[in-house]
Curated annotation (Swiss-Prot):
It is found in: Nucleus. The lineage of its organism: Eukaryota, Metazoa, Ecdysozoa, Nematoda, Chromadorea. Expressed in the VA and VB motor neurons and at lower levels in the SABV neuron pair. This is Basonuclin zinc finger protein homolog. The gene is bnc-1. A zinc finger (C2H2-type) spans 107-130, 135-164. Probable transcription factor. Involved in motor neuron fate determination and maintenance, acting as a transcriptional repressor to counteract gene activation by transcription factor unc-3 in a subset of motor neurons. Required throughout development to repress transcription by unc-3, probably acting by binding to specific promoter elements. Represses expression of DA and DB motor neuron-specific effector genes, such as unc-129 and unc-53, in VA and VB motor neurons. GO terms for molecular function: zinc ion binding. Its main location: nucleus. Pfam families: zf-C2H2 (PF00096). GO terms for cellular component: nucleus. GO terms for biological process: cell fate specification; negative regulation of transcription by RNA polymerase II. The keyword Transcription applies. Residues 145-168 are annotated as: Disordered. It comes from Caenorhabditis elegans.
């Protein structure tokens, strides 16, 4: 006799199962009969609802799938259309608000009603155009005039002596010589003559 496998160990589960079957056999038979009846009723109901022709069945299935796909596409297109409309409305509102803010920030001139981005640009405009304030160079002997302080300061800060020379002085081969600005700047063919002198001054009224 084998010590590892005691006797009747293999036959015990079989005996337990057989005794359980003998006790519960009538209940199991009733359950099987009920399940068979239910399955038969379901099959008869399904067969009465479905048409006999297989072509009609396939056509119905195809039409249902087509209707479902069309409904899904319509829902998606409506959703995408709504999102696009919302984005367009938001961008238009943002553009409107940004243009309104830009218009509010801009400053208009009281005299000519031109608009400028800030008060500094408006001040430069009024002093240069309407008040005709001219700013002369601070270097002695230069005498050049500018419409804005910025350009005057940029000119004055440059140490190049050629920039600060008077307009009437020109460089010749040997040194400095005095000449009239009309003769040096304009050719003789543009000058009208001594009887009708050309007014080249930029003093606008």
């Amino acid at each position: 006799m084998d010590v590892r496998f005691p006797p009747y160990i293999f036959s015990m589960p079989h005996l337990i199962y057989n005794s359980w079957l003998s006790l519960n056999a009538p209940k199991l038979a009733q359950l099987q009969l009920q399940s068979i009846k239910l399955v038969g009723q379901d099959k008869s109901i399904n067969q009465s609802e479905l048409p006999v022709n297989s072509e009609n069945i396939s056509i119905r299935v195809e039409t249902e799938t087509n209707i479902d796909s069309l409904a899904k596409e319509e829902k998606l297109s409506e959703h995408v259309h709504d999102e696009k409309a919302d984005k367009i409305e938001k961008t238009s509102e943002d553009n409107d608000t940004s243009t309104l803010l830009k218009l509010k920030r801009r400053v208009a001139c009281d005299i000519c009603s031109k608009s400028f981005c800030d008060k500094g640009a408006l001040k430069i405009h009024t002093s240069a155009v309407h008040l005709r304030e001219m700013h002369t160079c601070t270097v002695t002997g230069c005498g050049k005039q500018f419409s804005s302080r910025r350009s005057r300061n940029r000119h004055s800060s440059n140490n190049n002596p050629k920039l600060h020379m008077p307009e009437s002085l020109t460089l010749t081969g040997s040194g400095l010589s005095m000449k009239t600005s009309l003769d040096t700047f304009w050719p003789t063919r543009f000058l009208l003559g001594k009887d009708h002198p050309l007014d080249l001054s930029l003093n606008l009224v």
